[in-house]
């Protein structure tokens, strides 16, 4: 099917035609509707991208779609699902998957992602991203779910590593081994959430650097950064919560620096979903990520020049 035919089909269906904005090497932020006027009036914000939660746009129309359409006309968009329950024990919700696929078709996002987690059981929905045991049975089931999603949306899915607050005795492999197995079986890409790595490493007492060294970086198509909250568990020990309600912590920036030094610039999204600040604050976080990536990219270019010389 030619590009002209695809455009004609979209026009017949009343689907807007959007430009194919590149996302490689860019930093972005969560898109919040209250920021739209400030974004449209911001002459300094010219090169980033925005991420939206798919479930906020599963209605037929109205203000949410009008706002997202304006953003998509000028910027790359990352579509991030939070309710697919890919890690759950039961079949995927076909209606939810169809609505997700319709959004992919409508907005042609640069990036499409979901979580390695579950949120439904029987007819009950839990408003959270819950962990799963890392076993061969779980690996097979999650791989089947990923393959189903990829077949329906017609493109690879990026799968996000979770933040966790407990571990399962039933697990027979590490999280990174489980994720590598999913990549092998499905060909999916990965969304590396560095804040999640730091939160889980702190809560469970393992090395975030060791985790990253074992992570299949060659398959990472997007990075997430976010803020977290420090609490105490029942025994008085430090417990980190992936709260997305404050600036990125220094320790997470340092891990991000390590990853970009190793892999080069990867599309990076700063999440902020609670206690949402004014647009300039969120923009400043994304600009910090962009500056770090640009610095490493400049270093790589300089090294290439030296080698060629």
Curated annotation (Swiss-Prot):
Coiled coil: none annotated. The keyword Cytoplasm does not apply. InterPro entries: MbnB/TglH/ChrH (IPR007801), Xyl_isomerase-like_sf (IPR036237). Keywords: Plasmid. The keyword Transferase does not apply. HAMAP family: UPF0276. PANTHER family: UPF0276 PROTEIN HI_1600. Belongs to the UPF0276 family. This is UPF0276 protein RB0508. It comes from Rhizobium meliloti (strain 1021). The lineage of its organism: Bacteria, Pseudomonadati, Pseudomonadota, Alphaproteobacteria, Hyphomicrobiales.
């Amino acid at each position: 099917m030619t590009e002209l035919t695809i455009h004609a089909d979209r026009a017949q269906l009343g689907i807007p035609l959007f430009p194919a904005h590149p996302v490689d090497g860019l930093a972005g932020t969560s898109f919040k509707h209250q920021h739209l006027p400030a974004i449209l009036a911001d002459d300094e914000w010219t090169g980033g991208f925005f991420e939206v939660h798919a479930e906020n746009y599963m209605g037929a129309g109205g203000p949410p779609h009008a706002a997202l359409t304006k953003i998509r006309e000028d910027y790359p968009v990352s579509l991030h699902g939070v309710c697919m329950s890919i890690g759950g024990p039961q079949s995927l919700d076909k209606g939810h998957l169809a609505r997700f696929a319709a959004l992919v078709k409508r907005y042609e996002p640069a990036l499409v992602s979901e979580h390695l987690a579950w949120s439904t059981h029987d007819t009950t929905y839990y408003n959270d991203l819950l962990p799963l045991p890392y076993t061969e049975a779980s690996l097979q089931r999650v791989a089947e779910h990923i393959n189903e999603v990829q077949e329906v949306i017609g493109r690879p899915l990026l799968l996000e590593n979770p933040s966790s607050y407990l571990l399962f005795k039933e697990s027979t492999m590490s999280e990174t081994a489980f994720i590598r197995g999913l990549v092998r079986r499905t060909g999916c890409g990965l969304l590396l959430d560095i804040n999640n790595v730091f939160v889980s490493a702190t809560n469970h007492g393992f090395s975030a650097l060791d985790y990253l060294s074992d992570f299949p970086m060659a398959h990472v198509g997007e990075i997430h950064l976010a803020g977290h909250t420090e609490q105490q568990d029942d025994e008085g020990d430090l417990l980190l919560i992936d709260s997305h309600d404050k600036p990125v912590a220094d320790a997470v920036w340092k891990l991000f620096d390590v990853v970009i030094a190793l892999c080069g610039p990867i599309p990076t999204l700063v999440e902020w979903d609670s206690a949402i600040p004014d647009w300039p604050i969120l923009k400043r976080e994304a600009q910090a990520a962009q500056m770090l990536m640009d610095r490493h990219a400049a270093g790589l270019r300089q090294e290439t020049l030296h080698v060629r010389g």
